[in-house]
Structures are given as C-alpha cells and as structure tokens.
C-alpha cells in the first residue's frame, strides 16, 4: 500500500477567508479525518471506512467549520476577509 498505517497527511484549506488544517491519519481499517483551527485545536474529527462514509463525514465537517466560524469570529473578521478577496 502507498500509505502505511499511522501515516499522517496534512493540508491547509480556506473557508470564507479563514484558514483551517486538515489532518488525515491512516488506521488499520479506517481513516481518521480531523479539522483543526489555526492554533491546532481540534474542531471536529471522524473515522471513515468507505466512500459512502466519506461524503457523510465531509458534510458533518463542513457544518462544524461553519459553526466554528459563527462562534469564533465577529463581523469585523468577516469584513476583513471580504476585503481581502479583492
């Protein structure tokens, strides 16, 4: 196999101007997906064992990200991100 059990892949991604980190870890029979904020705090995480689980997990993680944005940012933060899109 390409990835060994225990391997961790990381990726920075952006939602509405806010940066998050995606951490994916291969386990024996599943993949652990965790979304982290800029400080490395876990926002949400799930175990996925097949493609059907993946699509459900992605919907749940997106919802968690939008909840985090709502609870951890203010109007000025959102305005700054809108301006920075120019």
Functional labels for PLM-detected ranges:
Residues 2-3, 39-86:
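Mixed-charge, Lys/Arg-enriched low-complexity segments
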Residues 5-36:
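Amphipathic, interaction-prone secondary-structure segments
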């Amino acid at each position: 196999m390409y990835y060994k059990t225990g391997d961790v892949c990381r990726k920075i991604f952006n939602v509405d101007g806010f940066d998050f980190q995606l951490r994916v870890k291969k386990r024996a029979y599943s993949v652990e997906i965790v979304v982290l904020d800029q400080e490395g705090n876990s926002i949400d995480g799930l175990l996925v064992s097949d493609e059907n689980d993946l699509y459900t997990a992605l919907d749940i993680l997106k919802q968690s990200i939008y909840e985090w944005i709502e609870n951890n940012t203010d109007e000025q933060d959102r305005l700054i991100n809108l301006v920075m899109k120019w």
